[in-house]
Amino acid sequence: MENFKRYIVLWVSQSISQLGSSMTAFALILWTYEQTGSALSVSIMSFCNYVPYILISIFVGVFVDSHRKKAVMLVADSIAALASLLILAFSMTGTLSAGHIYIFNAVAGTTTAFQQPASSVAIAKIVPKDKLTNVSGMNSFSSNLVVVFSPMLAAVLFSAGGLPLILLFDLLSFVAAFSVLLFLIHIPEQIIREKFTSPFAGIKVGFHFLKNETGILYIMLTMATINFFPD
């Protein structure tokens, strides 16, 4: 029960941090379109975010398995926060450009590719098995709230104080989430080093698993199709 209580604290802090990150992402879209008036610029932002995320996600599972999950999460979050801090500095000095935002989105996509699998494994290790269903519901609830409210909050704050105000909120939410993870959360580690000599070896094993477990493969293909054609 103690671990579950600590997870609740982690969940709250991570949810607030996720809200800050989502607000920043939406505010950057507003800023870019306001400055350029180009839908193409917004499309390039998405491209810069998703391409690194997709490419790195292919290999990152092996990396996460062979390193401490807490360290991976802390480093990934710190790099993302540093990128936000740089965007804030550029914004405050009036030197921010669309090019800076493209680079920021690439960094954000990269850090997310590392943070998400490490977080998923960490949650499974610190939460009692009988509470995993609760955790799944809590995560879905918070993620949906972020999706619904982050654009509205970002638009309000963007109108009130511009991009710097949203970036400041994002950085404060990072400090809270980072502190909780660093000082309050202990993640039991089981580091796997012996199975794979390279990321490609791990990918090969993954494809072999999907070949044998066709049910899981069909579910993945179905979900991919649904996400590709959301309407």
Residue ranges and their predicted role:
Residues G94, V121, K125, L163, ...:
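Helix-loop junctions on the cytosolic side of multi-pass membrane transporters
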Residues S78-T95:
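C-terminal ends and interior cores of transmembrane alpha-helices
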Residues G161-L168, H208-D231:
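A single, central transmembrane helix in multi-pass transporters
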Residues F104-V147:
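Cytoplasmic helix-loop-helix junction between adjacent transmembrane helices
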Residues M1-Y7, H186-M220:
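Juxtamembrane intracellular "pre-TM" segments in multi-pass secondary transporters
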